[in-house]
């Protein structure tokens, strides 16, 4: 594997689009970035390019939603041809829409099918094929259930890397949002998987809110995936290269990141992208700092207006007290 899962940003539907990933890459050169989940049906039958990304995003992983081995293999070949660094199969999303398509968390109950899907993709690509899963579904939440799933997908499918969302998923009765919050976290269960399967690469996801927490998990596991916190407080990523990967590169200031984002915004605007589609990912950059509310408000109120351009970002930046721009 040419990239590391030591720290990654989770695939988040409606959030981790290519604009978000470009922005996150400015904050950290080493963090592994994931696409939003893309269904095989969208790739095969949909209109538009669902595999588009910026070359600057590497290392970047493409997450698939699907359960047809033939379709997944076809899409995996396309992904490798497009230059993605990793393919990830979603076995963790609990939404009704996903279940109706027979993919996501409900596949935990069909480990042989998941293994077949992974094997089909691995047979046609050279890049890693990984799985993101939960610790259980509904009342199937014993440790034995999880170990059987991991063992089957690893042994029959050849999967060598799993990211475990350390909550179980309720397939009915809870919304996707509630499924990210209500089922209790059980990190020790992920730790035990690593002890029982030491030859596998195991990362954990769910509820991680700081690099300090990430470091604690890394004492037990190979990787940590951060979700909502990385999106809502993106400057968290600014010290990943130094604290998690041990690099000695200087930590970027927030104002520097904004200025580095400007040419990208300008380029996208010239191609017809609306300003708000890019700036929405930047709203949390000054979280918990003086001027943060004014920054968010100015962008939120103005980025959607017809003809909105770089001046909206510059005006919002002017709302931040001068002394704060040095940090």
UniProtKB/Swiss-Prot annotation:
InterPro entries: Aldolase_TIM, DUS-like_FMN-bd, DUS_fam, DusA, tRNA_hU_synthase_CS. PROSITE patterns: UPF0034. It is an enzyme of class 1 (oxidoreductase). Transmembrane segments: none annotated. Its cofactor is FMN. The record marks 90, 177, 180, 293, 296 as: Interacts with tRNA. The active site is at residue 93. It catalyses: 5,6-dihydrouridine(20) in tRNA + NADP(+) = uridine(20) in tRNA + NADPH + H(+); 5,6-dihydrouridine(20) in tRNA + NAD(+) = uridine(20) in tRNA + NADH + H(+); 5,6-dihydrouridine(20a) in tRNA + NADP(+) = uridine(20a) in tRNA + NADPH + H(+); 5,6-dihydrouridine(20a) in tRNA + NAD(+) = uridine(20a) in tRNA + NADH + H(+). The keyword RNA-binding applies. It comes from the Bacteria. The keyword RNA-binding applies. Its EC number is 1.3.1.-, 1.3.1.91. Keywords: Flavoprotein, FMN, NADP, Oxidoreductase, RNA-binding, tRNA processing, tRNA-binding. FMN binds at residues 11-13, 63, 132, 165, 205-207, 227-228. Disulfide bonds: none annotated. GO terms for molecular function: flavin adenine dinucleotide binding; FMN binding; tRNA binding; tRNA-dihydrouridine20 synthase activity; tRNA-dihydrouridine20a synthase activity. Catalyzes the synthesis of 5,6-dihydrouridine (D), a modified base found in the D-loop of most tRNAs, via the reduction of the C5-C6 double bond in target uridines. Specifically modifies U20 and U20a in tRNAs. Belongs to the Dus family. DusA subfamily. This is tRNA-dihydrouridine(20/20a) synthase. The gene is dusA.
């Amino acid at each position: 594997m040419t990239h590391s899962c030591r720290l990654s940003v989770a695939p988040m539907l409606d959030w981790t689009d290519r604009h978000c990933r470009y922005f996150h890459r400015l904050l950290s050169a080493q963090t592994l970035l994931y696409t939003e989940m893309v269904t095989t049906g969208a790739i095969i039958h949909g209109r538009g390019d669902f595999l588009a990304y910026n070359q600057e995003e590497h290392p970047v992983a493409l997450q698939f939603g699907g359960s047809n081995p033939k379709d997944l293999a076809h899409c995996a070949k396309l992904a490798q041809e497009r230059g993605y660094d990793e393919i990830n199969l979603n076995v963790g999303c609990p939404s009704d829409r996903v279940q109706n398509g027979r993919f996501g968390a409900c596949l935990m109950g069909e480990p042989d099918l998941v293994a077949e899907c992974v094997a089909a993709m691995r047979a046609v690509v050279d890049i890693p094929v990984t799985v993101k899963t939960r610790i259980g579904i509904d009342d199937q939440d014993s440790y034995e259930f999880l170990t059987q799933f991991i063992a089957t997908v690893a042994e029959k499918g050849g999967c060598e890397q799993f990211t475990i969302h350390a909550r179980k998923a309720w397939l009915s009765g809870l919304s996707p949002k509630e499924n990210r919050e209500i089922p209790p976290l059980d990190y020790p269960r992920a730790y035990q998987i690593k002890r029982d399967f030491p030859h596998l690469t195991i990362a954990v996801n769910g509820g991680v809110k700081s690099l300090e927490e990430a470091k604690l998990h890394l004492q037990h596991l190979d990787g940590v995936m951060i979700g909502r916190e990385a999106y809502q407080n993106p400057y968290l990523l600014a010290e990943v290269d130094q604290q998690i990967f041990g690099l000695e590169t200087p930590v970027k200031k927030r104002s520097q990141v904004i200025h580095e984002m400007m040419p990208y915004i300008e380029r996208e605007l010239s191609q017809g992208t609306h300003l708000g589609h890019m700036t929405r990912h930047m709203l949390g950059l000054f979280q918990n700092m003086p001027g943060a509310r004014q920054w968010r408000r100015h962008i939120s109120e103005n980025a959607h207006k017809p003809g909105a351009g770089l001046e909206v970002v510059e005006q919002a930046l002017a709302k931040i007290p001068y002394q704060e721009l040095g940090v």
